[in-house]
């Protein structure tokens, strides 16, 4: 069975934490296809600071050394907000016989009940939840705990060989980097070069983004 991983985010900007997390995931799971999915107008996050075109360009630059990583722009090409359920339905129509796995952060798992038609997500894809220790102390919503009790399975072969319906928690390493922090530091003219791929850093400086 062809296995597909979908890593969604605003990537505003894409940073080394995104890359290192993805490399760790691929080293452990080895998905046949791995897509970075830039979001358009996230329904439960503030609007992005860079344009869609700029965010895609930064992704292209960041992923140049990693030809196995692809970019999927279907959310940007849509005229509606970024509802993941629509995106997964689109993937499922295109890849009817494949295993689909949506990669989300632990904070995304806690916020899952806020997602549009969130109950349908698990029927369309597996969930690979990236553990982040700072969220472990937060209470898990009852609806999410019920979901975990029913669908959690940390056997990686389940994700690779089942169309949908499993949740796996995985520690991909801890990287103290966030797009929000990078934007704030750039605005304060602080050095962020070590947190960004070199080509992305050069692009941000050239475009004078996040100033």
UniProtKB/Swiss-Prot annotation:
Function: Catalyzes the reversible adenylation of nicotinate mononucleotide (NaMN) to nicotinic acid adenine dinucleotide (NaAD).
HAMAP family to which the protein is assigned, alphabetical: NaMN_adenylyltr
Protein family (similarity comment): Belongs to the NadD family.
Keyword terms of this UniProt record: ATP-binding, NAD, Nucleotide-binding, Nucleotidyltransferase, Pyridine nucleotide biosynthesis, Transferase
Top-level taxon of the source organism: Bacteria
Enzyme class: transferase
Keyword Ion transport: no
A GO term, aspect molecular function: nicotinate-nucleotide adenylyltransferase activity
The keyword Transferase belongs to this UniProt entry's keyword annotation: yes
Catalysed transformations (reactions): nicotinate beta-D-ribonucleotide + ATP + H(+) = deamido-NAD(+) + diphosphate
Disulfide bonds: none
NCBIfam families: cyt_tran_rel, nicotinate (nicotinamide) nucleotide adenylyltransferase, PRK00071.1-1
Pathway terms, separated by semicolons: Cofactor biosynthesis; NAD(+) biosynthesis; deamido-NAD(+) from nicotinate D-ribonucleotide: step 1/1
InterPro entries attached to this UniProt entry: Cyt_trans-like (IPR004821), NadD/NMNAT (IPR005248), Rossmann-like_a/b/a_fold (IPR014729)
Entries under PANTHER family matching the protein: NICOTINATE-NUCLEOTIDE ADENYLYLTRANSFERASE-RELATED, PHOSPHOPANTETHEINE ADENYLYLTRANSFERASE
GO BP terms: NAD biosynthetic process
Enzyme Commission number(s): 2.7.7.18
Name this polypeptide is given: Probable nicotinate-nucleotide adenylyltransferase
């Amino acid at each position: 069975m062809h296995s597909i991983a979908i890593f969604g985010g605003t990537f505003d900007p894409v940073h080394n934490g995104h890359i290192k997390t993805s490399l760790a995931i691929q080293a452990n799971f080895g998905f046949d296809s791995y897509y970075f999915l830039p979001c358009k107008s996230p329904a439960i996050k503030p609007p992005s600071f860079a344009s869609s075109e700029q965010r895609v360009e930064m992704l292209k630059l960041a992923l140049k050394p990693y030809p196995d990583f692809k970019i999927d722009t279907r959310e940007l090409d849509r005229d509606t907000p970024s509802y993941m359920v629509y995106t997964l339905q689109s993937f499922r129509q295109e890849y009817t016989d494949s295993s689909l796995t949506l990669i989300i952060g632990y904070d995304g798992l806690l916020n899952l009940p806020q997602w549009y038609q969130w109950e349908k997500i698990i029927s369309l894809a597996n969930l690979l939840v990236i553990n982040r220790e700072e969220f472990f102390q937060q209470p898990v919503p009852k609806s999410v705990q019920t979901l975990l009790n029913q669908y959690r399975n940390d056997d990686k072969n389940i994700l690779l060989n089942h169309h949908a319906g499993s949740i796996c928690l995985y520690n991909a390493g801890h990287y103290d980097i966030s797009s929000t922090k990078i934007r704030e530091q750039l605005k304060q003219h602080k050095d962020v070069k070590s947190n960004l791929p070199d080509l992305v850093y050069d692009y941000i400086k050239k475009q004078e983004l996040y100033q």
